[in-house]
A protein has these predicted regions:
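Unchanged
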Residues: 1-203, 315-331, 337-343
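Left-handed beta-helix
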Residues: 132-133, 141-343
Length: 343
């Protein structure tokens, strides 16, 4: 992120009880209230508030321009989802010009869109506020003993009719370098199954979440890992990956990876097979081991000849298994030693 950080900076703010008598974060609004000093010190015209459990790419400039053009005081990014998901999101009723007429937080019977009876207009949990309104509402909410101190449950519904509030249609957001007809990508990854599905999306020939747009690079930490390596080319002992993403430092030493997302410095030994799985950093897959439809946390060691994802009744006695059959294996505290690599 060096080039980015030459002009910008990031201040990580861990949860903390800043004021006497305060508890840990009681809701999304309280999380901002407990750090309100940072907003007041920066004194910006606008504050962008974004959830951390979603996967998407967004040109925030376009949403800010919409907010300014509408002379909005609060703007909610929204996207149509099937009505069966209404109970999972805040649902917006909006006028044709985008004015928010009502906000229903996680109601299964929330009204559908006027032009589409099968979908609701769901809040993405991303907001832009004009600072004066935001500060006023945060202070008022903190004093309200009947509030759950949450944007979706408390602040946004209370703003309807009191302040100019608009819904920004995320479907109109455009990323430089993407094809004109590219649909915006957004996934809520608040569940294990959703997290798994989002990773599996990356396997596509032309993934909906495009990691390869040179005009819109993903800013992330850079490491000094060597390139991934694939070794051995013998029957039953061929290092290869198909329809997969393989990160730096990973070595496929006679092992097969198919339809998977592999983290950094993973070792897949001879005869091992990893299919349709998400493997985090520093995992070690032993000889002839088989892993299918699983999420392996960092530093997991799969013993030789072990199987994961083939017998759910057995897996449930050892690991966590979701209703859809995704096996989640907890990591170990110690890292895999590079020197133990066996070929």
């Amino acid at each position: 992120m060096g080039g980015l950080l030459q002009q910008h900076f990031i201040i990580p703010v861990p949860a903390q009880m800043r004021s006497p008598g305060e508890d840990w974060y009681r809701g999304t609004a309280d999380a901002l209230h407990q750090n309100i000093n940072l907003i007041e010190q920066a004194d910006p015209h606008y504050v962008a508030i974004f959830g951390a459990d979603h996967i998407y790419r967004m040109n925030i400039r376009e949403m800010l321009e919409y907010h300014m053009h509408k002379r909005s005081q609060a703007t909610i990014a929204a996207i149509p989802v099937h009505k069966n998901q209404a109970a999972e999101f805040g649902v917006i009723e909006a006028a044709p010009d985008g004015t928010v007429l009502a906000f229903h937080e996680k109601r299964a019977d929330a009204p559908t869109m006027p032009d589409d009876p099968e979908r609701v207009f769901a809040s993405m949990g991303n907001y832009i506020f004009s600072t004066n309104l935001l500060l006023r509402e945060l202070y008022a909410d903190a004093e309200n003993e009947n509030s759950s101190h949450d944007f979706g449950r408390d602040i946004l519904p209370s703003l309807v009719g009191r302040a100019p509030m608009y819904a920004y249609d995320f479907q109109t957001n455009r990323i430089p370098g993407d094809p004109p007809n590219q649909e915006p990508y957004w996934r809520d990854v608040g569940t294990i199954d959703a997290f798994y599905d989002a990773n599996m999306d990356l396997r596509a020939i032309s993934p909906a979440l495009n990691l390869y747009n040179r005009q819109w690079p993903l800013r992330t930490a850079s490491y000094s890992d060597p390139p991934a390596k694939f070794i051995f080319d013998e029957q039953g002992r061929r290092g290869q990956a198909i329809d997969s993403i393989v990160s730096g430092g990973t070595i496929l030493s006679g092992g097969m990876v198919r339809g998977s997302v592999m983290g950094r410095n993973v070792k897949v030994h001879s005869g091992a097979v990893v299919e349709d799985s998400v493997v985090f950093d520093n995992c070690d897959i032993g000889r002839r081991a088989r892993v299918r439809r699983a999420i392996l946390d960092k530093n997991v060691r799969v013993p030789e000849d072990a199987t994961i994802g083939f017998n759910h009744e057995r897996d449930k006695t050892l690991y966590y298994v979701t209703e859809s059959g995704i096996v989640v294996v907890e990591g170990h505290r110690s890292t895999v030693e590079v020197a133990t690599m066996l070929v």
